[in-house]
Amino acid sequence: MTKWVYRFGDGQAEGGARDHEMLGGKGANLAEMCALGLPVPPGLTIVSDACNTYYSNGGHIDDRLKAEVRDGIAAIEAITGRHFGSTSQPLLLSVRSGARVSMPGMMDTVLNLGLNDETVQALGHDAGDARFAWDSYRRFIQMYADVVMGLGNDAFEEILEDEKAKLGHELDTELSATEWQHVVSLYKRLIEEELGQQFPQNPEVQLWGAVGAVFSSWKSARAVTYRQLHNIPEGWGTAVNIQAMVFGNLGNSSATGVAFTRNPSTGEKALYGEFLVNAQGEDVVAGIRTPHSITEDGRLSSGSDKPSMEKLMPEAFRELTRICTELEMHYRDMQDIEFTIERGKLWMLQTRSGKRSTRAAMKIAVDMVDEKVITEEEAVLRIEPSSLDQLLHPTIDPRVNRQVIGTGLPASPGAATGAIVFTAEEAVEAEAEGRKVILLRVETSPEDIHGMHAAEGILTTRGGMTSHAAVVARGMGIPCVVGAGTMRIDQRNERLLGIGVTLKKGDIITIDGSAGQVLKGEVPMIQPELSGDFGRIMGWADRARRMTVRTNADTPADARAARSFGAEGIGLCRTEHMFFEGERIHVMREMILAEDEKGRRLALDKLLPMQRLDFTGLFTVMHGLPVTIRLLDPPLHEFLPKTDDEVAEVAFAMGLEPLALRQRVDALHEFNPMLGHRGCRLAISYPEIVEMQARAIFEAAVAAAHETGAAVVPEIMVPLVGLRSELDYVKACIDAIAGNVMAEAGMKIDYLVGTMIELPRAALRAHVIAEAAEFFSFGTNDLTQTTFGISRDDASAFIPTYQRKGIIEHDPFISLDFDGVGELISIAAERGRRTRNDMKLGICGEHGGDPASIRFCETIGLDYVSCSPFRVPIARLAAAQAVISENM
């Protein structure tokens, strides 16, 4: 029989860190800390499978699960000496989510569960502090009404702010017991008026309401969005943790906080974190009050005049420091820890591997290798490949005179410039229109996740380094400044009030997430140097990986950038991109509109020196590294004007009648150009195009070899081949031109002719095509289109719906479909090598920079992946991780 509930407490636990898939990250680590003998409030964890059962039961909690939870609560009662629902020494509970990977702020929590009109009196009596009891009760009502009953926070906050204004209070901590009791009555009245029901007084009703709400939050809009952004499977579900409450709001000897064993922004080996006196944990995480530094060094560096925990609570600080060191050594990774101090006693509420900036991840991994804590291979595995994008963020030029209009905390490194927007929705709209924006919020909430993802940067006027905005921005690699108390956001009038300046929506600002500064206007930036810790990690990765990493580059500038990122060749040069530039488009149109072959050849003679110059530049930059050049691929109509205005403009420039040009454009029109007259089909229809391109390639190879002294071995790729006979025809053209150029130059040129495998038929007939092809490069963009029968340009109309409804887990145009497209690649690779055992195999679609797709390429033995220049470091790291993981 399935066990639904696992207990922990009093130094014993029924699970541990190894059980994170079943117990979720929070539950597994609570059990682990308990078994280590650390001070953990007793509790129980409902396994994540129960979440899926909850959904399959139509949102009903199983009776057997209820029975196991009741038994678990009885065990908590035995340890604490308190009783759930009792009017004497009542046991209060927290109910928290716990997915197997951290999803900060995306799911729901309920604290102080078990309070009602009677137990609040008992709690006040036991604690000797009626104010604390009523404060806890109002927190519970507000949280429960929001999470379980669906009544948002705003109305409650409005009541509280009105009451504080009437009483002349600025802070929540200034309210007395009687005043909190009145707030509670107002909260309960609001619930009755808005929902037509009373706030539940039965603790068990409260319990099952909270458990159901936590399960339900797994499918909340914000959680679904977060999982899609971070590729977390829908089917995992969340565990639920029910734990005895400990209180950080029991006066000035109590506190709550979050600590990192190392700095999550810089990676510095020093305790780092924030705390609030007389508060509960949600106050820190939600950014409702700006917290104080845990350490004295942290206080001094932030310029705060608020006392640190190190000075204010020295005994608790010493114990926290000891536990942090123990946990980091136990888990062999930087830890993110939540704690509460209840009247001087420290309690550990959570530990997990902390989210960190990529720069911090690099430093922590390198330092831990130097400290002999982890191996070089483990260090390589510690870096999320896609997070390397963070290192490519520009930084503000240090020579620039900064006009600082606000300062805050440096929550996520990098700099960003954009127009001010005040809502997440505006950020999403701006991204869709191609505009760069900075999202301004007093504090972000999980509902802002879509806007945070769309923005170039994030600025909040409240919150600390562990607030929602800070944690999420670091995870996304978005520059972020939080707690900018020198600024004020006027939400109603859409204004930002800074130091000596008032800005409105649409005005440009720059934020420096590394320095915590807000600057007026656009500021010059510089690209970072990828050295130091990055260089060491990538060096270890390069030693470990088997596959080479090439780049998709069409210009010498792209090639230079890619080489600086470690590219070992060009896996795809799209020659058609060269024809769209400047005057070339006019010559290309002249060729297309020519009446006969003679006219086409005259135009191609003009294009030849242009192409030769392009290829010479690429060969020179790559200095003997392999360069794969794809012959002209798109249909000819793509080079022609489309609208009547464009037709008139082009006709005038070319000395043609608009009507004649329109007729030629219409004649070239295709109903389905993706599957039409393109690729090798164009080459066969107009072999003179192939002849020109081949001559440009070989003449450029001669020129570059003379210039660099390095042998140039062009790899010429024929696109959209489905038949061996197609490749034979085009290859014969290429070979003939190669012979002519070699004779003219008086030198031998080594070269390869291969094909893109981008049609299912080509994959299935790879053993036959390999008789003529010397290499295969899998064009995964078109292979995905032709395998699924989905146009990539139209997929956005329904792929997100498919993901949301669980039809597919990932967008197949972003991460390779292993079962279908991947199977075709495997078949083609095996059959191709059966014919030609030394055949070179690679991929050159967008998937070449996707870590999951790269792991697949390693598994089936491809020789290289090729991706855009800025994804080369990602591919290098992912290729290494694929080898290391396979060998572990």
Label for each model-derived stretch:
Residues 45, 49, 444, 463-465, ...:
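Short, ordered loop/turn segments at secondary-structure junctions
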Residues 407-447, 498-536:
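Extended, non-globular alpha-helical segments
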Residues 96-97, 530-532, 540-888:
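Conserved alpha/beta-domain cores
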Residues 241, 421, 438-440, 459, ...:
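Structural motif
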Residues 423-425, 486-487, 535-538, 554-556:
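Intrinsically disordered, low-complexity regulatory segments
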Residues 1-400, 410, 429, 435-438, ...:
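Nucleotide/phosphate-binding sheet-loop regions of phosphoryl- and nucleotidyl-transfer enzymes
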Residues 345-347, 438, 445-453, 467-471, ...:
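Glycine-rich phosphate/ribose-binding loops and adjacent secondary-structure elements
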